[in-house]
Amino acid sequence: MKNAAFASLRTISVSSKGFMKQTDSQQYIQTLRLRLLDMSRVSQRAVDYSIKAYKLDSPEFCANVRDSTYEVNILHREITEIARDLLLMELPLESDARFALSAVLICDALHSAHAQAVKIAANSACLLEHGGMPGWEGLTRMGEEVNCMMRLCIIAVFDEKIAHAQTVLGNRGVERLFESVFYDWYSNVDQRLRARASHELAITKGLSQIAKETYEIADAVVFWMKGPDSGSTPHIDGEQPRIHAVPAREVEGVTHSPDGMQAFLDEIDACFADPSFCKTA
């Protein structure tokens, strides 16, 4: 898919030679990068808040997720338009063309992830209205795992490094394991609680979709960094994911075992708290 898209991209670029000044392209690229970082930050925060809305039974977090919808929609439109304009230019570097295409793919995935976060928050609000319920204990764990992958994707976009994206791709399919365990629980729920349990079903589906969007983002980062022949981690339908809850993983030389989930999340939190992380060149 990416090879075909990249070939089409190059055809557009060559056929539009001289359409815009090359000096404009770097300004467009810088603007596109800033907008993409803004959308990454806002979308990740929405996903984080939606998961906390369920975990903490917090109506405030539910409202905070909805409040960012307008901003995300504006950023999605702006990124799409800027990337389109870039693809009509004669870009001097092939890497610039890859970035423009990857920005569109990342932007679309972030937009979809945000939409799922809004749905998760809405279903969490419904659970609060019903006074809560004895829910599936694995849902909080699933939320932490998905949130972790989302954060790794955002770090990959900010740092423009491939290692975090490859870590996410190494987890591809983990959401199916959570879904399988959830459906076993859901099928045995007392019929009197089924209506309320349906909200947790919707939350589980939303988290699964966000996980799939993280794979799209990670694939796009790999394509951006390495090109159309990068051979990013393929998904084989018949392959069983290696992880049940949280995989052992190595990020920048630090190995995290399944028992080290909280330490791993704390490390990512520290990265987000570092003032230099949010600086843009």
What residue spans do the PLM features occupy?
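Short hydrophobic alpha-helical segments enriched in small aliphatic residues
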Residues: 4-7, 14
